[in-house]
Amino acid sequence: MREIVHIQGGQCGNQIGAKFWEVISDEHGIDPTGTYHGDSDLQLERINVYYNEATGGRYVPRAILMDLEPGTMDSVRAGPFGQLFRPDNFVFGQTGAGNNWAKGHYTEGAELIDSVLDVVRKEAEGCDCLQGFQITHSLGGGTGSGMGTLLISKVREEYPDRIMETFSVVPSPKVSDTVVEPYNATLSVHQLVENADECMVIDNEALYDICFRTLKLTTPTYGDLNHLVSAAMSGVTCCLRFPGQLNSDLRKLAVNLIPFPRLHFFMIGFAPLTSRGSQQYRALTVPELTQQMFDAKNMMCAADPRHGRYLTASALFRGRMSTKEVDEQMLNVQNKNSSYFVEWIPNNIKSSICDIPPKGLKMAVTFVGNSTAIQEMFKRVAEQFTAMFRRKAFLHWYTGEGMDEMEFTEAESNMNDLVSEYQQYQDATAEEEGEFEEEEGEN
């Protein structure tokens, strides 16, 4: 079967990861002790995508938890599903990375990385046919960003042909948790561009907005935000885990979404999102789901898709629905909003349908879009980076760990290149390409 090994790093990654395992376990009927209490054979049919079956019919997540300080791990272990994980798969240091990318990537993290890789190997060996890795981490801190990207490059070296998918929480525009976020994020993006296959970009501010506006929560907690992310994460892999009419997997997703290798940063969304009160008053239809799915307010990262154009998009539907209706809706969206899709990639929305909806819903959809508008986010981080780097503020924390200023300059220009690549394809039209070819032919 096509297994996925899940890795979570740093505080943010571990909190999102813990929530994700609650959601997945719920979908597959696994209780906090790893015992199956489900009501349908479908839950067990492909449970080995995310779980290993241990002795006595116990299901153990293929999850690796890493951090440079023990705090978050202890709270995961004490949390509702803490006893689910294999104790050997908790790998942690004692020092912490102190929000310093260099500590995570070069010093503290580098000391711990070998023990993480041992666990990764052990998990990979327990798979029949490993599909790939998914990593949850944030880019603003030290461990998830520094050590997370170090792990990605090491795993990349060892498993070059497996898909590497990340769920990366990027710094928010207005809310900043750490002053040095722009540094950590830029250094991380520099790595992700080269070593990851698909990055789902998430940010807290967009998640807060969804909680306020759509879910009508007055005081959303990180738990609520992480639940949103988990819903989308589970949607991305539901086709691997449940039977469907039109299947998709991580590799198909990558092939359909990435027109150029560097442009693999996606926005994700999830529908239906309704406030708890109004849930039972409406029956969902495919058109309604499609409408909400493409709504800018539904995106889990603070970039407005209306400011750019979609290169490609993928709609992963869940529930019983007609394939014909899904296809019609997808065509409909592209025809009505043609200016928001590049015309040089015809039919650029891929859809897939998985028969089993999430718990408590009749149908749902996860949206993954490759939009040029994501450059807004990179631009924002780059501006903050430049403002500090020009004055060499806070640099001594990084150079003290053995980093060189050159690395910062490289990361900065790599990020600026990425922004201009997105801009170039946003402006490109179908006709121009033809003209270029003719000119070349004449010479």
From Swiss-Prot:
Keywords of this protein's UniProt record, alphabetized? Answer: Cytoplasm, Cytoskeleton, GTP-binding, Magnesium, Metal-binding, Microtubule, Nucleotide-binding
User: What are its GO cellular component terms?
Assistant: cytoplasm; microtubule
Q: Is Ligase among this UniProt entry's keywords?
A: no
Q: Biased-composition ranges for Acidic residues?
A: 429-443
- Residues annotated as binding Mg(2+): E69
Please tell me where GTP binds in this chain: Q11, E69, S138, G142, T143, G144, N204, N226
Q: Which cofactor does it need?
A: Mg(2+)
Name the family. Belongs to the tubulin family.
Additional comment = The sequences of the two genes coding for beta-tubulin are identical.
Q: How does this protein assemble? A: Dimer of alpha and beta chains. A typical microtubule is a hollow water-filled tube with an outer diameter of 25 nm and an inner diameter of 15 nM. Alpha-beta heterodimers associate head-to-tail to form protofilaments running lengthwise along the microtubule wall with the beta-tubulin subunit facing the microtubule plus end conferring a structural polarity. Microtubules usually have 13 protofilaments but different protofilament numbers can be found in some organisms and specialized cells.
**What protein name does the entry list?**
Tubulin beta chain
Species for this entry: Tetrahymena thermophila
